Amino acid sequence: STMSSIYYASAYSEIWGNPDLKPMSEYDINLMWQLNRKYTFTAFAMLEPDYFVQMAYQPADRMAVIMKETNFDYSNCFGLQASAQFRLGSWLNGNVNATALYRHDKTQFFDLPIDRTRLSGIVSGMAVVKFSQRHNIQLILNPFFQTKAIQGLYDIDPFLRLNATLRYTSKDGKWSLVAKGENILNGHISTSSTIARQDYTMRVWMPYTNYSLTAVYRIGNFKEKQKKEVDTSRMGY
């Protein structure tokens, strides 16, 4: 909020507005090289002057947590990413992405000067296992792992997420049975702030573990529209 107001969420938690909050800017630079149509290498930079985010602050003179959106001087990320496709016979194929990310956050938050850097790693991908060509049964795995990272005051613990899909399609292509599991390892993002006088921890569950079973019958010559997958390997969740 850009209002100069204070909302008391509880006896302990306060949400402060910030009338001095400014719009942020973002500049992206990418340099990509592809080898043999199987391997892709990318160097990138994300420069964000006046980046803003809501952070928590614990004052020294009273028991309270103040949540306030604040502008950084900048939040800059520089990284290298390598992507590869793989295939093992007719029963296994997929891709893997590995990213090395260097982040530098700088700002002044209340009486806390923040000038922090961190080198993090992200590994993600997709694996398709075909159990039976005759019966068209396949398992799709989508893992995501991020090492320790930072955001302003916060330290972000390593995070592992795994989604899985088991799909059966009839020989004529009309029937499909799809079983899905999202976040089946019940992963969560844990953040903590322990610099200076701060001692604050928060867990973010995104999303909760859930399972679904779907039966699909295609009428006539209907074909499912192919959707282009969004590259989320640098998003951090």
Can you annotate each of these PLM segments?
Residues 30, 34, 38-42, 93, ...:
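Membrane-spanning beta-strand positions in outer-membrane beta-barrel proteins
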Residues 31-35, 45, 84-90, 100, ...:
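Residue-level signature of outer-membrane beta-barrel architecture
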Residues 1-2, 17-21, 29, 48-56, 66-72, 84, 93, 103-109, ...:
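Outer-membrane beta-barrel proteins
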Residues 117-237:
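Conserved C-terminal beta-signal and adjacent last beta-strands/turns
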Residues 22, 28, 41-97, 106-122:
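Outer membrane beta-barrel strand-and-loop segments of large Gram-negative receptors
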Residues 1-28, 43-63, 182-198:
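Surface-exposed extracellular loop regions of Gram-negative outer-membrane beta-barrel proteins
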Residues 27, 33, 41-47, 96-102, ...:
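Transmembrane beta-barrel strands of outer-membrane/channel proteins
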